[in-house]
Amino acid sequence: MPAYRSRTSTHGRNMAGARSLWRATGMKNEDFGKPIIAVVNSFTQFVPGHVHLKDLGQLVAREIEKAGGIAKEFNTIAIDDGIAMGHDGMLYSLPSRELIADSVEYMVNGHCADAMVCISNCDKITPGMLMASLRLNIPSVFVSGGPMEAGKVVLSTGARKVDLIDAMVSAADDSMSDADVAVMEENACPTCGSCSGMFTANSMNCLTEALGLSLPGNGSVLATHADRQRLFVEAGHLIVDITRRYYEQNDDSVLPRNVASFAAFENAMSLDIAMGGSTNTVLHLLAAAQEGEVNFTMTDIDRLSRRVPCLCKVAPSVATVHMEDVHRAGGIMSILGQLDAAGLLNGDTKTVHATSLRAAIDRWDISRTNSDSVRQFYLAAPGGVPSQTAFSQSQRWDSLDTDRENGVIRSKAHAFSQDGGLAVLFGNIALDGCIVKTAGVDDSILKFSGPAVVYESQDDAVNGILTGKVKEGDVVVIRYEGPRGGPGMQEMLYPTSYLKSKGLGKACALITDGRFSGGTSGLSIGHCSPEAAEGGTIGLVETGDMIDIDIPNRGINLRVSDAVLAERRKAMEAKGKDAWKPVAPRKRKISSALKAYALFASSAAKGAVRVLKD
């Protein structure tokens, strides 16, 4: 039977000094035999998804103590990708994921904590904490801050729901008046919480439900709704229960690596494909799998993408549907329920809260359960009042969305498409693969061919789009923006948003070794691997080269002969130390911290995790 890790610092005469320090934090004699639970918070006033978390760590801590544990809270950093977007701040976003994972490891191992509750929300925080959980492999429960309410505006063209992406696109749309743009800006993000569509943050919080590491509703109940408080209260009691099961009953089924197994990663990816989640989730799931020593790869994602249909379309894929609508339709448990009914789910996987994922679905899927409390839970609605306070409203929908033919969540027979919402493409321009969010691609451009317009930075691409250098039918190529080449693998939200604002959203394609925001839609292909800085073919593309994209057949190819590519590669490598770098120096200050990340960063095909030599 495993010994409590915390006893390393709380038991024995030689630990008198450590116990003295523990006492200075408030511990008493009777506390030294109790499990020490780390409450890993991520409160910051910089990020709307985290601005309301300040008191929630202590809410969880009090519940842990009621259940018989000792709670010790600390915070990680948290970067807001939307605020960091469009300037060099975005270089720090993906590397911050590794810092978050490391900081959790440092704190938890440095103080010998027995278990942890992870309070995350936004883009890199949930993945960073997930990586730490699988790295440490101690009992863990995830509870996020919850989604933001969608904005609501009345413009000169009428009333509509809006989100952050709408505000960004409108600002670049010359046909919109300054007054309408101001209305969009002031109303797109009305409350605390992670941005209201199926962007990266919400996608990742939904996936923790499929992995079995969070409670039902974690991905969908609004940050402002009173019902979300129950998740934090239950998390405090649940973590003490599973901690005792592991340390006192030798039940290792509750450990993250046994919960988030290969089959669970298949479930999470199947959910992502079915709900048209952010392409960034691919990057983060691959990284988390590596931390958990799970052999889950791009090949597995490609296999799943060919069999899982698209059952749910949410903003940015459909402008009128947001997370509040997904919740009304039964949330993640109902999407998983439809996958299970279609034979596309591993229902026997473990969870921290139920005997199996299928048992959880039976209880929480509104299509299966007769529970009034469950149905009431999924009636939680937006309050419609701007607020930065958690649990500040208790509005309810009049009815649930149980329509599986034409509703927000659909059955396999009535899927938006039998082809899933994400796809992996392979070809000579991406030998190790690249990712496209097919849920956001118009059917008319699932097959697309056009001449390349090559840019060696996001800034140059934005300038080219805004000054009319990109024309209908072009394939915009943005390279040297990968994990090493950026460094930091910037999101390309501005280029895709500006293509939409110029009316080119359905008339152009974009390929990059960088990545995309969860708010991206259109024929936007990212994570091109190997990246240009690694010697990938994308570094050999020249303006005017024809590129063929074939999503139905999962192909992406540069229409250039192998012989010509070999000549270009030879010429590139002849540049010596200047090979596989932008032709012209970029106005980009790369700090020593970013250089350290670039030195060890792996390919996007491996999750862009750091790879250290033995």
Curated annotation (Swiss-Prot):
This entry's Enzyme Commission designation comes to 4.2.1.9
Residues annotated as binding [2Fe-2S] cluster: 122, 195
GO MF, one example: magnesium ion binding
For this protein, the record's InterPro entries field holds: Dihydro-acid_dehy_C, DihydroxyA_deHydtase, DiOHA_6PGluconate_deHydtase_CS, ILV_EDD_C, ILV_EDD_N, IlvD/EDD_N
Query: Which EC class is this protein assigned?
Result: lyase
Q: Which cofactor does it need?
A: [2Fe-2S] cluster; Mg(2+)
According to its UniProt record, in which pathway does this protein act?
Amino-acid biosynthesis; L-isoleucine biosynthesis; L-isoleucine from 2-oxobutanoate: step 3/4; Amino-acid biosynthesis; L-valine biosynthesis; L-valine from pyruvate: step 3/4
Question: How, per the record, is the cofactor bound?
Answer: Binds 1 [2Fe-2S] cluster per subunit. This cluster acts as a Lewis acid cofactor.
Entry GO terms, CC: cytosol
Q: Indicate where the modification N6-carboxylysine is found in the sequence.
A: 124
Pfam families reported in the protein's UniProt record: ILV_EDD_C, ILVD_EDD_N
Chemical reaction(s) catalysed: (2R)-2,3-dihydroxy-3-methylbutanoate = 3-methyl-2-oxobutanoate + H2O; (2R,3R)-2,3-dihydroxy-3-methylpentanoate = (S)-3-methyl-2-oxopentanoate + H2O
What UniProt keywords apply to this chain's record, in alphabetical order? 2Fe-2S, Amino-acid biosynthesis, Branched-chain amino acid biosynthesis, Iron, Iron-sulfur, Lyase, Magnesium, Metal-binding
Q: Where is the signal peptide?
A: none
Q: Which domain of life is it from?
A: Bacteria
GO terms (BP aspect): isoleucine biosynthetic process; L-valine biosynthetic process
Q: Where does Mg(2+) bind?
A: 81, 123-124, 491
Function (record text): Functions in the biosynthesis of branched-chain amino acids. Catalyzes the dehydration of (2R,3R)-2,3-dihydroxy-3-methylpentanoate (2,3-dihydroxy-3-methylvalerate) into 2-oxo-3-methylpentanoate (2-oxo-3-methylvalerate) and of (2R)-2,3-dihydroxy-3-methylbutanoate (2,3-dihydroxyisovalerate) into 2-oxo-3-methylbutanoate (2-oxoisovalerate), the penultimate precursor to L-isoleucine and L-valine, respectively.
| Assembly mode | Homodimer.
Q: Which family does it belong to?
A: Belongs to the IlvD/Edd family.
Official protein name in the record: Dihydroxy-acid dehydratase
Q: Species name for this entry? A: Rhodopseudomonas palustris (strain BisA53)
